């Protein structure tokens, strides 16, 4: 019984949402990006908290620059959510990337087609290796697209955003899901608190 409880606690501690990148890591990844498109992919995954399939589904028509909003589509026939663009530098970059296009996928491959999910994985892993940044999760070596979603959620939480705001931002159907994932303290926060209190 004790062993089972210990294993359950270990799994809980190793939840992916407890591990995230810091803003300084995001900047390093942006700098290490091979081209402007990849830089915008990093920023979009982070500043919009998108899942990778939401990223590849993103269309020029989904962007409302005037109101700084993005219409995020999960898939055909599925519900959409409205996400605010909260970083002005990112808004400027996205405008530049889209240029004069009125419609079509925002992120294109070298063949001028929408990026595949596999391509997004490769781009993130490659940039992570180039920047020398590994996945903070002990069970995963390379960066993956979802780490940016965890990272922006933790960043917003640290800035005092409510769990309800983060729930709507990420598109969680359940408030409980948001609280289970981000209502707890992160590994970095645990370490920082330990250093602060034990060093007193």
Locations of regions flagged by a protein language model:
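C-terminal catalytic core of Y-nucleophile DNA break-rejoin enzymes
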Residues: 75-95, 104-126
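Basic, Lys/Arg- and aromatic-enriched nucleic-acid-binding interface segment
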Residues: 19-52, 77
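Short, charged phosphate-coordinating catalytic segments
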Residues: 45-67
């Amino acid at each position: 019984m004790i062993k089972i409880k210990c294993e359950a606690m270990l799994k809980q501690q190793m939840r992916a949402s407890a591990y995230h990148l810091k803003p300084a890591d995001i900047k390093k990844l942006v700098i290490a990006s091979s081209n402007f498109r990849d830089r915008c992919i990093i920023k979009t995954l982070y500043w919009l908290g998108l899942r990778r399939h939401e990223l590849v589904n993103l269309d020029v028509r989904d962007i409302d620059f005037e109101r700084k909003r993005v219409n995020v589509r999960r898939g055909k026939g599925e519900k959409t959510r409205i996400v605010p663009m909260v970083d002005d530098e990112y808004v400027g970059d996205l405008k530049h990337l889209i240029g004069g296009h009125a419609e079509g996928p925002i992120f294109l491959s070298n063949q001028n087609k929408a990026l595949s999910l596999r391509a997004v994985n490769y781009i993130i892993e490659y940039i992570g290796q180039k920047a020398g940044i590994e996945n903070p999760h002990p069970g995963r070596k390379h960066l993956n697209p979802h780490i940016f979603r965890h990272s922006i959620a933790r960043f917003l939480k640290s800035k005092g955003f409510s769990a309800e705001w983060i729930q709507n931002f990420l598109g969680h159907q359940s408030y409980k899901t948001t609280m289970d994932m981000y209502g707890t303290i992160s590994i970095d926060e645990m370490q920082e608190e330990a250093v602060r209190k034990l060093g007193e």
